[in-house]
Amino acid sequence: MEKTVQKQFVDLLEEHQNIVHKVCRLYTNSQDQHNDLFQEITIQLWKAFPKFRGEAKFSTWMYRVALNTAITLYRKSKRSIQTQDYDSVMFKISSEDYDDTVEQQLKLMYTKIKELNDIEKALVFLYLEDKNYREISDTLGITEVNARVKMNRVKGKLRKLLNP
């Protein structure tokens, strides 16, 4: 590809790499897995970049590619490894002044989110990213109404998981 296309891709990836890192955190349990998934998502983004038409925001398109790649790899790894060690999950919280109680609650919440199915995880992830239902539906390729219904069900499911 041309240097300008390559530079455009690298610039956009650098600008929005936090999206990929957040998806990686949600679907991996170790730094090595995180790095592998980040690399695989980057490869898939590069392969798909010529097809990006700009009809949606780049970040929306990036979410879609990243989530689809993560879900595909997660399903493959789930088939080969049935057990996962949730105690080894480390969450980096990007805010200051969290007391231990808040940190423990966040850790519990993310552990429970990891128990959701792939689509539910993606819904929660996008919801926590403050995406509106239109953006969620565009990213996941579902209708806006379906995104709302699924999100309400997932909220109820998470409530039950967090408060048995």
Residue ranges and their predicted role:
Residues S80-L106, N132-Y133:
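Internal acidic/polar
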Residues D36-I43, K47, A56-N68:
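Structural recognition of an alpha-helix C-terminal capping motif at a helix-to-coil junction
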Residues I41, V65, L123-V124, I136-S137, ...:
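Hydrophobic positions on the alpha-helical face of helix-turn-helix-like DNA-binding modules
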Residues M1-K22, N35:
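A short, charge-rich alpha-helical start-of-domain segment used by transcription regulators
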Residues L13-Q31, A48, I113:
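Amphipathic, Lys/Arg- and hydrophobic-enriched alpha-helical face
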Residues L140-P164:
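DNA-recognition helix of helix-turn-helix
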Residues E115-E135, T139:
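Short amphipathic alpha helix immediately N-terminal
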Residues K51, R64-Q84, V102, R153:
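Arg/Lys-rich amphipathic alpha helix in sigma70-family domain 2
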